[in-house]
Amino acid sequence: MVFRRFVEVGRVAYVSFGPHAGKLVAIVDVIDQNRALVDGPCTQVRRQAMPFKCMQLTDFILKFPHSAHQKYVRQAWQKADINTKWAATRWAKKIEARERKAKMTDFDRFKVMKAKKMRNRIIKNEVKKLQKAALLKASPKKAPGTKGTAAAAAAAAAAKVPAKKITAASKKAPAQKVPAQKATGQKAAPAPKAQKGQKAPAQKAPAPKASGKKA
């Protein structure tokens, strides 16, 4: 991010240490590179010179002329409502929490510890509930009817087993028929041989004719 907190007239600053630590002031004039003339009419800080080391610049800027009187500074402060805006910032909330923690006793710290444990337990239980709900939404069919799906899977497996057997039998049947056909083919082969044998006696038929002539 671009740095925008520059030292200028009207810039509101937070006093980090010194006699006015924890208060807000507005820069009225710049004396030199180390000091500035500041005024805090609404924070009970009189106009005085203050080193920049004591100040931390904020994002708030007031509109008043150079070296303006306290009256104009107060009017600009109230018009911008700096006090409420500052109280709503994270910076002010952290400072307040740090101060509150520094003032805590042992019993207060014990109560805080017990409260944190209860909070963590509640959060953990809620997270588990949300995780279970997410799982149920992700798999609505599997979660409610696991038994039905198991039975359906068993039935499908049982149905597949005889189907496989039938297909195996159907595959084996043609394999058995093929050798049968081959056997018949082998048996048919001798038939022509027998026919050839029959042709031989047909060729021998002239023998009786010869015997007829002799007769």
From Swiss-Prot:
Q: Glycyl lysine isopeptide (Lys-Gly) (interchain with G-Cter in SUMO2) crosslink - at what positions?
A: 124
| GO biological-process terms attached to the record | cytoplasmic translation; ribosomal large subunit biogenesis; rRNA processing; translation
Region annotation (2 X 3 AA tandem repeats of K-[GA]-Q) maps to 193-198
Could you tell me one molecular function GO term of this UniProt entry?
structural constituent of ribosome
- In-chain residues carrying the UniProt-annotated modification N6-acetyllysine: 79, 85
Region feature (4 X 5 AA tandem repeats of Q-K-A-[PAS]-X): 171-190
Q: Which family, according to UniProt? A: Belongs to the eukaryotic ribosomal protein eL14 family.
Q: What is this protein called?
A: Large ribosomal subunit protein eL14
The gene name on file is RPL14
